[in-house]
């Protein structure tokens, strides 16, 4: 009988355990404390290739996944993801599609062709539905195309508006999305694992309090550690590293749309202006994934924009890590350019480029990314 290598090793360990006459303490392997190698980012005004502005759809009480009846049409809402639309898209799609379980309808409509609409449409197709997307804009003209793409469910709700019911929705959506994206990690979808370094000048990383939903989400990130002084390659005193995923919107949204069309999904470019027009669609099961558009379409005045401005530098393939901080700045190394942020201007509807913000973001990122300052 042939023994596998794993079986042989298991047997050997068992044999050694049986031969032991006393307990021997096991010493953990000592992790070498070498400085992380990070390629410098060439942050110069001359390397800027574009700056874009987007409005994220924020609700202080959190995203809305709920049912509403319009005459003989059932609308399932799925919008208001704040700064985590890409991050949470598969998770809230799972919640929304679950609300249709047991209904007889097998033909449905999805309103919106951003990341939330496409994710919802794909999950519906995978469960046997025939889906038509109605949308005002298609990629690359959606709000989702003006997103960073770092998997991190942040700026989703106000702490003082958190309810036990939403907390559970939020945790469930985060966990589901984190698992689903792992199945898509590939060049085809523009999804990859990268180390992300959280940079701070004020103190080391502190785990979320137990009452925070992030206490259940933070353990999802693998290979997390606070870097010691000898390991820290950045000119700030406190650096926390963990692994997460970068989802590149330009690649990812096109791939999702391609999957949808290959599965015989239909897209109709059409703007719907009122609930009456929604109720007039031939499909009587409708998923509303219109983001900030739900404010006017369904009268949700809780929706408010969070303005974000992103500046891109020429690509640097050798940069294979992300940074967040200090403060509100961040850097993501995408194929379409080195993305530098950021701004989080709540309640601001202006989509005009702000030159002073460009200079601030360049200067603050250059201070921590332009090369090693430690010997």
Question: Which role does the model predict for each range below?
Answer:
Residues 1-15:
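N-terminal secretory signal peptides and thylakoid transit peptides that target proteins
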Residues 11-15, 53-72, 144-146, 183-259:
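Flavin (FAD/FMN) cofactor-binding and adjacent substrate-gating region
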Residues 24-71, 80, 84-94, 115-127, ...:
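Active-site substrate-recognition segment that forms the wall
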Residues 84-88, 166-173, 240-255, 353:
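Short beta-strand to alpha-helix junction loop
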Residues 106-114:
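Beta1/beta-strand and adjacent pyrophosphate-binding region of the FAD-binding site
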Residues 138-173, 229:
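Glycine-rich active-site loop/strand segments that organize a redox cofactor
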Residues 244-315:
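Predominantly flavin-linked oxidoreductase catalytic cores and closely associated redox partners
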């Amino acid at each position: 009988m042939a023994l596998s290598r794993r079986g042989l090793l298991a047997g050997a360990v068992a044999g050694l355990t049986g031969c032991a006459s006393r307990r021997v303490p096991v010493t953990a392997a000592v992790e070498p404390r070498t400085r992380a190698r990070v390629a410098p980012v060439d942050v110069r005004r001359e390397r800027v290739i574009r700056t874009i502005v987007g409005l994220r759809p924020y609700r202080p009480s959190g995203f809305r996944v709920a049912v509403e009846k319009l005459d003989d049409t059932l609308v399932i809402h799925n919008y208001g993801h704040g700064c985590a639309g890409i991050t949470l898209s598969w998770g809230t799609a799972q919640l929304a599609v679950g609300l249709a379980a047991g209904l007889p309808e097998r033909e449905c409509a999805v309103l919106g062709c951003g990341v939330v609409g496409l994710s919802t449409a794909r999950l519906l197709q995978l469960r046997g539905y025939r889906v038509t997307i109605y949308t005002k804009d298609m990629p690359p003209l959606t709000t989702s195309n003006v997103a960073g793409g770092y998997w991190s469910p942040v700026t989703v709700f106000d702490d003082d508006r958190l309810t036990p019911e939403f907390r559970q929705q939020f945790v469930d959506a985060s966990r589901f999305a984190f698992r689903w994206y792992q199945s898509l990690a590939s060049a085809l979808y523009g999804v990859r694992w990268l180390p992300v370094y959280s940079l701070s000048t004020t103190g080391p990383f502190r785990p979320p309090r137990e009452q925070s939903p992030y206490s259940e989400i933070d353990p999802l990130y693998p290979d997390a550690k606070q870097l010691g002084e000898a390991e820290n390659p950045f000119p700030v005193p406190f650096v926390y590293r963990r692994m997460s995923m970068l989802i590149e919107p330009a690649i990812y949204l096109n791939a999702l749309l391609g999957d949808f069309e290959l599965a015989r999904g239909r897209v109709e470019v059409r703007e719907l202006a009122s609930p009456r027009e929604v109720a007039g669609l031939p499909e009587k099961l409708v998923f509303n994934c219109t983001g900030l558009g739900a404010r006017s379409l369904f009268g949700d005045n809780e929706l408010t924009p969070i303005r974000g401005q992103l500046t891109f530098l020429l690509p640097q393939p050798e940069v294979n890590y992300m940074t967040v901080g200090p403060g509100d700045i961040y850097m993501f190394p995408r194929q379409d350019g080195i993305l530098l942020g950021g701004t989080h201007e709540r309640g601001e509807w202006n989509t005009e480029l702000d030159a002073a913000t460009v200079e601030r973001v360049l200067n603050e990122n250059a201070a921590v990314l332009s090369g090693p300052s430690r010997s």
